[in-house]
Amino acid sequence: MNETIVVLGAGVSGLTSALLLSRDKRNTITVVAKHMPGDLDGEYASPFAGANVMPMATSDESQWERETWAELKRLCQEVPASGIHFQKCQVHRRNKDISMNSDVPKGPFDTNPWFKDMFDDFRELPQDKVLPGCDGASEFTSVCINTAIYLPWLVGQLLENGVQLKRGVVSDIREAKRLSHTGRPATLIINATGLGSYKLGGVKDTNMYPARGQVIVVRNEVDSMLFVSGTEDGANEAVYAMNRAAGGGAILGGTFEAGTWDTQPDPTTALRIMSRIVKVRPDIAGGEGVAGLSVVRHAAGLRPYRHGGARVEAEKMDDMTTVVHNYGHGGWGYQGSYGCAKSVVEIVDKVREGRTRAKL
């Protein structure tokens, strides 16, 4: 049975869902979104991501990230045009951060992480390699994604597969049914609106909330990714740095401010972020401190967090149109993108099979 599918949202979750669905030629797909790759708006989270693979799920919920790692690793090795490269990653933990109540994710700093068998070269660092003030550290090879290249690359893959993209704003998810480029009513809607699901009519998921993240993009380079579990500047701040592929600059961060909707960068916060980075990695600025950082831009985006975790499931609307939700990924949208999109495809296939059986 052929499906006419409308995907709402052109962040990494929506685009990846559309990509995997487009590999089945029975699906005719239209992506409709308020924001498209190339836009910079705080409510459009995907361009502001680092983006990298730093596992955040619990062991029981790790399958999405495991499946995504395999694909991102393949793209890094085989498809340089995707804008992904390998980079060594160091994770430094302070025991007091792990036990305190803060918005900073705790999963990456587990002393016995589930993902140690996902990375071939995972190792605990000797104490003399641990940053001062930290209690332990680990190291492994991860990937960093230049989102300014990767998101347009995804769009290119969609166009090659016959997917149509168009801008549009909907106030209610039911409106998506009439937005297919074919002119036919959609038989399936994929809701990948992220934080938009908080206000979207027909969804209005009050479990959604923003976690503001402020970063600085600089021309300086870091020779490896760095993550530190916390700071002395407040429970909602951490230290991280990574190099985007293909001249994308280094991302310096950052903050995890739950419930904060403000997308304007704060100069005081920016100074704290830069000061912390040059303190633990003075080499990034040539030993010149903050003055040695060549700033490209300051930015703040809203991570789409959800109480109870990501929502990846089907729902029937009152007119019996099926909606498949794929939103609420918080700060792990990229590193869970292919796993979640695979789940979307599996749900769509089950819906299709159910309709076929019903007609027999």
Placement of each model-derived feature along the sequence:
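N-terminal Rossmann-like FAD-binding beta1-loop-alpha1 element of flavoenzymes
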Residues: E3-V31
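Flavin-dependent oxidoreductases
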Residues: T16, Y44, A176-R272, D283-E288
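Glycine-rich FAD pyrophosphate-binding loop
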Residues: R23-A45
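N-terminal glycine-rich dinucleotide-binding loop that anchors FAD/FMN and/or NAD(P) in oxidoreductases
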Residues: Y44-A70
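Short beta-strand to alpha-helix junction loop
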Residues: S59-T68, A137-W153, Q264-T269, G336-S337
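Flavin (FAD/FMN) cofactor-binding and adjacent substrate-gating region
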Residues: A70-G162
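C-terminal catalytic lobe of FAD-dependent flavoproteins
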Residues: D128, W153, G287-L360
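Helical element adjacent to the flavin cofactor pocket in flavoenzyme catalytic cores
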Residues: G136-L188, A192, S197-Y198, I347
